[in-house]
Amino acid sequence: MKVLKAAAAHTGLHVDWIPLPIGKEGHEKHGKTTPDETVQELQNTDGWIMGPIGHRAYPRNDPTWIMPPIRKLFDLFANVKPVKSYENIPSIHKNVDIVFLREVTEGMQSWDTNISGSGEFRPNDEISIGSRIITRKGSRRIAMEAFKIARTRQRKQVTAVHKEAVYRLTCGMFAEECRKVASEFSDVEFNEIHIDTIAAHLVMDPTKFDVVV
């Protein structure tokens, strides 16, 4: 809160801060990690910032402690993370300026699988299974966000990351939708890369990337 208030003061912006319980505090005060009162208040605010809510004190086997993804309640599908190097901060690579986008309402954490809860289940003590969901709608709209952001940047480049060669149906669907969206943005360069490959390139030379989805 000290940092947030200092940032607001620096801009001259007047902000009314409303602290709300969530996570461990929410459960201790209201009996659930995402209290209804908190959700209602969030719906009535202009914006909000969520601090760290994970805690090792949550009982492992108590399902009431599972945090219902608040991004699902508000359809916050795009996790946008800019990464940038600064001249006055020592770093291995100079001139790094990347925006990463990740779809966070689908995949392994979709909470919309045919299994209740997180989509994980254990048929016996030797096997655990996790399912994931990839949809055309979800793939298209995260790709669309990536291209919209790229269009506002100097390099105007989007790199789609997937593992289509192995996961032909799920990653394949994501890749297909990225290509369709790319055809609608003739002014933005588009390329694709294998997830294993980009892991190496980000270490060796991250400056070659602009917007990564």
Annotate the PLM regions:
Residues 39-57, 181, 187-213:
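Glycine-rich phosphate-binding loop
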Residues 26, 56, 165-169, 201:
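Short, small-residue-enriched loops and turns at beta-alpha junctions
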Residues 30, 168-177, 203-211:
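Short glycine/threonine-rich loop-to-helix capping motif typified by GTGT followed
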Residues 1-18, 38, 44-45:
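Acidic/polar, glycine-rich intrinsically disordered N-terminal extensions of enzymes
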Residues 10-36, 200-202:
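N-terminal beta-loop-helix "entrance" segment that forms/cooperates
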Residues 11-15, 44-45, 75-77, 94-98, ...:
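Short coil/turn connectors at secondary-structure junctions
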Residues 28-121, 126-129:
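N-terminal glycine-rich phosphate/adenylate-binding segment common to multiple enzyme folds
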Residues 1-10, 120-196:
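Glycine-rich phosphate/diphosphate-binding loop of Rossmann-like nucleotide-binding domains
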